[in-house]
């Protein structure tokens, strides 16, 4: 019997511009439809780090060019824009791949809002990298001219960082559940979801943040009662002592083992750390649930237990 699977797809895996994204989504669709062909129900969430940064940069340039005509675009609106154009390409690539294999299954992208706590400490400690990589000189210019917060990102260059509060709940969850139950392939929680918080009455207000897609996918997986959460990354398995002579790749982890390795500092913040933390949270959320961290092209083999790092009780 097939499983209900939530797949967390990284924004970096979608390329840094539109032509790259159109190529990347075709490979993504093939790997996802491999799972659907095996009889699994699949819900896809995705990141938007490079894309939302690109959108905000473009909107900021527009405001600077004609400030009397164009007001600054809120970060929450930029996230919504990224959901639209990434979802558009993903949805069409999935539809095409399904039809190429004679699988009659609808695909739908849900514009998804995710509730956050406006008092989350993350708003005072920005950690989420967005946008393109910069040189040290470019980063210094962004800090001095625009007041951006910038960090060095995993030795690959410098990036802007923004607030990344923990997701609390998914506003459109019932619609997502209904679509899954109706047999649709659903794309949801794009870019971690549009960050919102509740104000007076039933009003939702956008927050200046980008939610981590791994944590949002964990909440999504719990709320759709998934069996498995697959977090895709740039390596086939999780490693301890990564990049060192005594590097060790892990086939499986218990939550307690994962916490031990987290405490020892084996996983980099903003990179593998949130993936492992989200995987542990999901694995502990109910009996029988498991998470898998692996490469996109290894997802099918990972579900079959042939590769990847499995996290389970």
Each language-model region and where it sits:
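C-terminal catalytic "cap/lid" subdomain
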Residues: 2-313
């Amino acid at each position: 019997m097939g499983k209900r699977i939530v797949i967390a797809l990284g924004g970096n895996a979608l390329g840094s511009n539109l032509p790259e994204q159109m190529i990347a989504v075709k490979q993504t669709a093939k790997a996802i439809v491999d799972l659907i062909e095996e009889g699994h129900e699949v819900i896809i969430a995705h990141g938007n780090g490079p894309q939302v940064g690109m959108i905000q940069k473009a909107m900021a340039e527009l405001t600077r060019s004609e400030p009397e005509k164009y007001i600054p675009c809120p970060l929450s609106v930029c996230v919504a824009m990224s959901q639209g154009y990434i979802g558009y390409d993903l949805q069409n690539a999935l539809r095409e791949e399904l039809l190429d294999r004679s699988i009659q299954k609808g695909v739908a992208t849900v514009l998804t809002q995710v509730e956050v706590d406006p008092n989350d400490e993350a708003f005072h400690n920005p950690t989420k990298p967005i946008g393109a990589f910069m040189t040290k000189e470019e980063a210094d210019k962004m800090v001095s001219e625009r007041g951006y917060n910038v960090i060095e990102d995993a030795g690959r260059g410098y990036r802007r960082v923004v607030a990344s509060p923990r997701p609390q709940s998914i506003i459109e969850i019932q619609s997502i559940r209904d679509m899954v139950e109706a047999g649709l392939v659903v794309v949801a929680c794009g870019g971690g979801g549009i960050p919102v918080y509740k104000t007076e009455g039933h009003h939702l207000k956008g927050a200046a943040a980008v939610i981590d897609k791994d944590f949002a996918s964990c909440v999504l997986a719990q709320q759709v009662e998934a069996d498995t959460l697959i977090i895709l990354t740039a390596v086939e398995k999780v490693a301890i002592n990564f990049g060192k002579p005594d590097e060790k790749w892990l086939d499986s982890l218990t939550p307690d083992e994962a916490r031990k390795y987290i405490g020892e500092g084996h996983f980099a913040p903003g990179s593998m750390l949130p993936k492992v933390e989200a995987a542990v949270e999901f694995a502990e959320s109910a009996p029988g649930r498991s998470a898998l961290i692996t490469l996109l092209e290894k997802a099918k083999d990972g579900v079959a237990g042939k590769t990847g790092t499995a996290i389970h009780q």
